[in-house]
Structures are given as structure tokens and as C-alpha cells.
Regions:
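N-terminal signal-anchor module of multipass membrane proteins
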Residues: 2-90, 94-97
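Kinked, hydrophobic transmembrane alpha-helices enriched for aromatic residues
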Residues: 24-52, 85-93, 123-131, 268-276, ...
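Juxtamembrane membrane-water interface segments that cap and precede transmembrane helices
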Residues: 62-76, 206-222, 284-288
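Specific transmembrane alpha-helix
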Residues: 84-99, 139-151, 228-251, 298-318
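Solvent-exposed interhelical
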Residues: 148-169, 242-264
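Long hydrophobic alpha-helical segments that form multi-pass transmembrane helix bundles
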Residues: 166-245
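Alpha-helical transmembrane segments of multi-pass integral membrane proteins
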Residues: 287-392
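Membrane-proximal cytoplasmic C-terminal regulatory module of class A 7TM GPCRs
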Residues: 394-413
């Protein structure tokens, strides 16, 4: 379908502009995504704060069966799966905002300015989070890429998909060529050892001052790193934007074929790269190729999981849109998803206290299974906070501040 370049969402000329009900799947996906991010970050980064060895997958302690099982599970469903969900949902959010501005009659330059302010503020929040709490922040990169996406809101869908596909293909071809070259030079075993170094020992944490110093170092390095990250993140964000523009998640029954295709491709990519990557991490597959491919090709699992959720909960969305209450088991996840920024930053506060060598300094020598439980426990705390805020009818404090700084006291007009 071709679109008017200035229209974020195609609407029949004879129909009034509808006010769509709030979608449950994006919030549900955000809530689940935060669990994946918590578990992945504990293994790859937070354990370094306690003085432990970092790893992309976690370590096997005393030949533990549970550690091995955890590594096999997380390489397929956790590591390099949370951030692509985040990327897709952030692009989806840009699409929803663009549609809202169009319905309000904003001219294109003004709409771009509103989106640029919103994601510029997200980048500032990310920079502060990176320096003062966690150098592994992702909001800075997403905010800066969001600024670029503000320029693309009027681009035709076909062009956006072409851009996304081309960037994704180039990224994977370069990654594959690079890893094959490294494997030829280093050998599979040495390459896997290099990959499993995770965040490495470059960012030692001995005091809170070292947290600040490391954050500043990474922030300065982001000047060069974020353009490279954009090759991996932007295709997923563009896909999310198109999903919003086309109303795919808003009407899953109409778009069932697209959702099924996305879910199928995503699951094949996640398992097809994640399972071999797990075998590599356990030393059962003497290569390092899949440890890279799971972070490039395997990211298709992110939008795939979102599509799967849309298919599974299509009936629930229809009933909620008709006025039915959200089912009780889904409410905590949705409450957290609506407050994802607060939940994400709160994770950092919790894990800094738990892992920081200048604080509790726990779990430095923990295996993959125990770190999975620790990450889950930290996520559960954020879930409880979100439920309490929902019960009180309060937004997340960071969401409220972000909205105020982005749109002003009166909000969007």
C-alpha cells in the first residue's frame, strides 16, 4: 500500500479519525522485556560491579546442570532478545506519537519538532543514567536514534522497509565476515573465550567514584559507538514504526498473516542462533560464529516475540477494546510496561546496591542459574512498585517528568 508522504497512518477520507483504545500488547511486551533486560544485564555487566567475571552468557560453577540449562535457555530467549524488543517498541511509540500529532492537525515541521524534543529528552535521561548509575544504559542511544527518526515520519512505508532491510542485511554480512576472519586468525576456541568475556575487566568498580568515572568514559565513547549501534537498532525501530503506521498491533485479526510471519521468522532466528550459541558457550561446539550471529541475526526474535504476543492476546485486546477489564494476571505486567522507564532505572538502583563492591557486593562468584534468579528478583521488585503506582492511580515518576519536560505543563494541544 502506498501512503501520502505527510501522513503517518492512512485513514479513509470519508471516515472520522477514530480514537483507538489503549493497546495491551505493547505494555505487556515492555513488562516482559524488562525481565529479559534485568537478567541479561546482571550476567553481562552488574556482576562486574561486585568484582566478578563478566560473561555474555554466565558461568558454569562446579559443573552445575542448572547453570548449563540456564545458559541454553538464556542464549535463545534472553540475551540479545530484550533490547530488540525495546527497539521495536520504541519505533512503535514514535509511530503512535506521529499518528496522534497528525490527528491533532500538527503540520509536519511542528510534529517533527515535538518528536525531536521528546527523544532528545530521552537521550538526556539516558546520559544521566549512564553516568550516575549504569554505564550499560540504552536510553541514550535510543534517544539519539529517535532524533533521527523524527526526520523519517513522512517517508513512505515501502522506503522505510527498504531502509530497514538494507541496514539489517549489511550489518549481518559485515558481522559474519568479521567473525569468520577472527575465527580463521584466532581459532574457534579463542574466539569463544574472547566473546564470553562480556563486559570484560576494563570497567573496574571499587567505589561510587569509579562508577561515575566509568560512566563518563562510556558516555564519551558513545560519540563513536552510537553511530555503529544505529546499524543494529535502527532497522528494528523502523519496523516498529511501520507496525504502528499500518495498525498491525491494533488490529491483529486483520494482520494475522503478517504477525504469523514475523513470529515464525523471529522464533527461527532466535532458536537457530541461540541454541548453537549456548552450545558454544558450554564448549560443546568449537566455534564462535553463533555467539556473534545471535546478537545480529538473532535480534529478529525481538519483533517475533511481540508478534507472538499479539496473536496470543488478540482476543483479549478485542474484549478490552469493547469495555471488558484487563484480565487480572496481565495487570502487573501491563502496569510495569506503562512505567517502563521508571522500572528500567529502578533496576539500576537495586542492582547497584546489591552488586556494588562499595555496597553489599554480593554474587561475585555466582553461576548462571543463581544470577538468573537474582535478576528475576530485582525485576519482581520493580513489578511490585509498578502495581502499587497503578493502584494509586499514579504514573511512573520518570514518565511524568519526561512528559512534562517534553511537552510542557499543558501537554500536547
Amino acid at each position: 500500500m502506498e501512503h501520502q508522504p505527510h501522513r503517518p497512518i492512512p485513514l479513509p477520507a470519508s471516515s472520522p479519525v477514530p480514537r483507538a483504545p489503549r493497546l495491551i500488547v505493547p505494555d505487556l511486551a515492555r513488562g516482559l522485556m524488562l525481565w529479559g533486560i534485568a537478567v541479561a544485564n546482571v550476567t553481562t555487566a552488574w556482576v562486574v560491579f561486585a568484582g566478578g567475571p563478566a560473561s555474555l552468557t554466565g558461568w558454569v560453577v562446579d559443573d552445575s546442570f542448572w547453570d548449563k540449562l540456564t545458559i541454553m535457555f538464556t542464549t535463545s530467549f534472553v540475551h540479545a532478545r530484550g533490547f530488540p524488543m525495546f527497539s521495536t517498541l520504541l519505533g512503535f511509540g514514535v509511530g503512535l506519537i506521529a499518528a496522534s500529532l497528525y490527528r491533532r492537525g500538527y503540520p509536519l515541521p511542528k510534529a517533527r519538532g515535538v518528536i525531536a524534543r521528546r527523544y532528545g529528552m530521552l537521550a538526556i535521561f539516558g546520559a544521566l543514567h549512564m553516568v550516575f548509575l549504569f554505564w550499560g544504559d540504552i536510553m541514550l542511544a535510543y534517544g539519539l536514534i529517535g532524533l533521527f527518526m523524527a526526520c523519517l515520519i513522512a517517508v513512505r512505508t515501502r522506503v522505510l522497509l527498504w531502509m530497514a532491510g538494507s541496514l539489517f542485511a549489511v550489518t549481518n554480512l559485515v558481522a559474519l565476515a568479521g567473525v569468520l576472519l577472527l575465527e580463521a586468525v584466532l581459532g574457534g576456541g579463542q574466539l569463544q573465550e574472547l566473546l564470553n568475556g562480556g563486559s570484560g575487566d576494563l570497567l573496574q568498580v571499587t567505589s561510587y567514584w569509579s562508577v561515575l568515572l566509568n560512566g563518563l568514559i562510556v558516555l564519551l565513547g558513545s560519540i563513536f559507538g552510537i553511530p555503529l549501534q544505529a546499524f543494529m537498532l535502527l532497522p528494528l525501530m523502523l519496523l516498529g514504526f511501520v507496525l504502528a503506521r499500518e495498525g498491525v498491533l491494533a488490529d491483529p485479526a486483520r494482520h494475522r498473516r503478517v504477525l504469523a510471519w514475523l513470529a515464525g521468522v523471529g522464533l527461527v532466528a532466535a532458536l537457530g542462533t541461540g541454541v548453537p550459541a549456548g552450545l558454544e558457550a558450554l564448549g560443546l561446539l568449537p566455534t564462535g560464529v553463533f555467539g556473534v550471529l545471535t546478537m545480529t541475526l538473532g535480534v529478529l526474535g525481538g519483533p517475533g516475540f511481540i508478534a507472538l504476543l499479539a496473536l496470543v492476546f488478540a482476543g483479549v485486546q478485542e474484549r478490552v477494546a469493547a469495555g471488558a477489564p484487563v484480565p487480572a494476571p496481565l495487570r502487573p505486567l501491563i502496569a510495569l510496561g506503562k512505567r517502563s522507564m521508571t522500572g528500567y532505572v529502578l533496576q539500576s538502583v537495586i542492582f547497584l546496591a546489591v552488586f556494588g563492591s562499595f555496597a553489599l557486593g554480593l554474587f561475585a562468584d555466582a553461576g548462571a542459574a543463581l544470577l538468573l534468579l537474582v535478576g528475576t528478583a530485582g525485576w519482581l521488585v520493580t513489578l511490585l512498585v509498578a502495581v502499587a503506582l497503578e493502584a494509586a492511580g499514579k504514573p511512573g515518576p520518570l514518565e511524568a517528568l519526561h512528559r512534562r519536560l517534553s511537552y510542557g505543563k499543558g501537554g500536547l494541544i
